Amino acid sequence: MDKQLLETTVSKVLDEMRERPIPLGVSNRHIHLSAEDYARLFPGQPISEKKALLQPGQYAADQTVTLIGPKGQLKNVRLLGPLRRTSQVEISRTDARTLGIAAPLRMSGDLKGTPGIRLVSPFAELDLASGVIVAQRHIHMSPLDALIFRVAHGDKVSVAIEGNARRLIFDNVAIRVSADMRLEMHIDTDEANAAGADSPDAFATLVTPR
């Protein structure tokens, strides 16, 4: 195979790979806890896995809490594991209105200046001083995925949600690249409802890097 033919073949294969569906994950409200906060809310209770998530090593735990805000509460909010360095609560805009909390749109881990909330478990309660956010929609990628899609960590792209009658394009979708990540787009329940992404046939495709 000559060089030109090889380059043409590789280019064609990469184009096909860029057009492949991106798995879509709908993130319901959930919490991440530090080891210290977990021990206070679930004293003597080892964290236990209920369901593995697509991202390696991550899982939904059996443990749940109630979120209590100035105007309302949300029960049975799932803990995601493993435990983190800092506690964090991720909710939708609809959840924020229910709770009466002005949660800002942030990337996971960007918690400076965020509001707090009360967490109640079957064993104890804990007032977080900060950590409540509405998560920025994003796509997890491995370095190889990023190379194929020609994007880099921190880029913003436009993504189409397809496979249903309510095709919708989301702009400002953040790219998150890490060696331990698998290709998956994360949106919250408000975004999923708007896009009709509750359909099992729904998937994401990259429209254009921005």
Curated annotation (Swiss-Prot):
Determine if Mitochondrion is one of this entry's keywords: no
Catalytic reactions of this protein: propanoyl-CoA + phosphate = propanoyl phosphate + CoA
Cofactor remark: There are 2 Zn(2+) ions per monomer; Zn(2+) and CoA bind inbetween the 2 domains in each monomer.
Keyword list, A-Z: Acyltransferase, Bacterial microcompartment, Metal-binding, Transferase, Zinc
Tell me which residues bind Zn(2+) 1.
H30, H32, E90
Q: Name one GO cellular component term.
A: bacterial microcompartment
Q: What class of enzyme is it?
A: transferase
Which parts of the sequence bind Zn(2+) 2? H138, H140, H186
Give the record's pathway: Polyol metabolism; 1,2-propanediol degradation
Supply the EC number(s): 2.3.1.222
Which residues make up the binding site for phosphate? Answer: R84
Sum up the protein's function in the record's words. Answer: Involved in 1,2-propanediol (1,2-PD) utilization within the bacterial microcompartment (BMC) dedicated to 1,2-PD degradation by catalyzing the conversion of propanoyl-CoA to propanoyl-phosphate.
* Name of this chain's protein: Phosphate propanoyltransferase
Please report the organism this UniProt entry assigns to the protein.
Citrobacter koseri (strain ATCC BAA-895 / CDC 4225-83 / SGSC4696)
- What phylogenetic lineage does the species belong to? Bacteria, Pseudomonadati, Pseudomonadota, Gammaproteobacteria, Enterobacterales
| The encoding gene | pduL
